[in-house]
Amino acid sequence: MALINYASREINCKIVYYGTGLGGKTTNLEYIFKQLAPGIRGEMISLATETERTLFFDFLPLDLGSVQGFKTKFSLYTVPGQVEYNASRKLILNGVDGIVFVADSQREKMQENIESLRNMEENLAEYGLTLDSVPYVL
């Protein structure tokens, strides 16, 4: 559930992009970054390896203005796609308000997509969450 701070009149919402390695999660955030005016978006932070793969996460803060007098902010994160970074994937899901699952469109990546989706469900379960309790987009 989004964090609502009544004292500062702010709503903060955490959206996590989840999926396989090189499936398009970072590309999604880069596209959003390029489409929004600098006053709306913050600086995009990306921790990538030498091969340009996400090492820990990408982060893009958005300030979407006011909703009924509350300043509305979104924090967009990507998880690393590689299974060996599962601890990072799990940590980034902590406090999630919504998920965008980015499936790789290549036919030969279908099994990896399924494994990544199952991994996401397992990691959500660590926080007592299911796909029935968190809004998501596939």
Regions found by a protein language model. Give the residues of each.
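Alpha-helix termini
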Residues: 6, 65-68, 123-131
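Alpha-helical scaffold elements adjacent to nucleotide-binding pockets in ATP/GTP-utilizing enzyme cores
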Residues: 27-32, 95, 112-120
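Conserved G1/Walker A P-loop phosphate-binding module
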Residues: 2-51
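Conserved beta-strand/loop subsegment of P-loop NTPase cores
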Residues: 97-101, 125-138
